[in-house]
């Protein structure tokens, strides 16, 4: 009996060695990515929550500056019925030199809720309040209320 010699071509050898990743290699990579996300993910979400709180504080400061300009022009702060909308439309009030907010619109807080304007305020002529991420009074963390009285 004769044995035939099989000669393997170099192109065939190359294809076998370049077959791709094994299942074990893929599982190791997916596990490593999962561990990294488990460690980094909560920190990123925490930074996002903190940045929304900071943005709300900055917007409240902007409203306070606009209300001070309104007061200088009209000699009073808007009443509870007028609210923050008085900063965008004058209602034919003598001395009104607005709009006092850019864009002519009162923006919502970073969580999409309306700001609350109360007059008289607790320790000032007015209070501006963002109810935080939960949209309800009270709370802690990102759900904590942010007020102009805290400035």
Language-model segment annotations:
Residues 94-100:
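Short, structured beta-strand/loop micro-motifs enriched in basic residues and often containing a Trp
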Residues 1-21:
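N-terminal leader/signal peptides at the extreme start of proteins
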Residues 18, 42-92:
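Conserved hydrophobic/amphipathic alpha-helical signal-anchor segments
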Residues 2-7, 50-54, 61, 65-69, ...:
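Short, surface-exposed interaction loops/tails
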Residues 20, 98, 125:
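A residue-level signal for beta-strand positions that form part of recognition/binding surfaces
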Residues 17-44:
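N-terminal single-pass transmembrane signal-anchor helix
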């Amino acid at each position: 009996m004769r044995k035939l010699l099989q000669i393997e071509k170099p192109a065939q050898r190359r294809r076998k060695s370049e077959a791709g990743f094994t299942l074990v290699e893929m599982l190791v990579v997916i596990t490593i990515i999962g561990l990294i996300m488990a460690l980094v993910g909560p920190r990123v979400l925490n930074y996002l929550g903190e940045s929304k709180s900071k943005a709300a504080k900055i917007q409240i400061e902007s409203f306070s500056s606009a209300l001070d300009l309104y007061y200088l022009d009209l000699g009073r702060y808007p009443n509870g019925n007028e609210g923050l909308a008085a900063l965008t439309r004058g209602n034919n009030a003598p001395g009104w030199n607005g709009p006092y907010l850019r864009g002519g619109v009162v923006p919502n807080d970073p969580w999409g809720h309306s700001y609350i304007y109360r007059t008289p305020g607790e320790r000032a002529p007015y209070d501006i309040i963002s109810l935080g991420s939960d949209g309800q009074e009270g709370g802690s963390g990102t759900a904590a209320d942010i007020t102009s009285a805290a400035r």
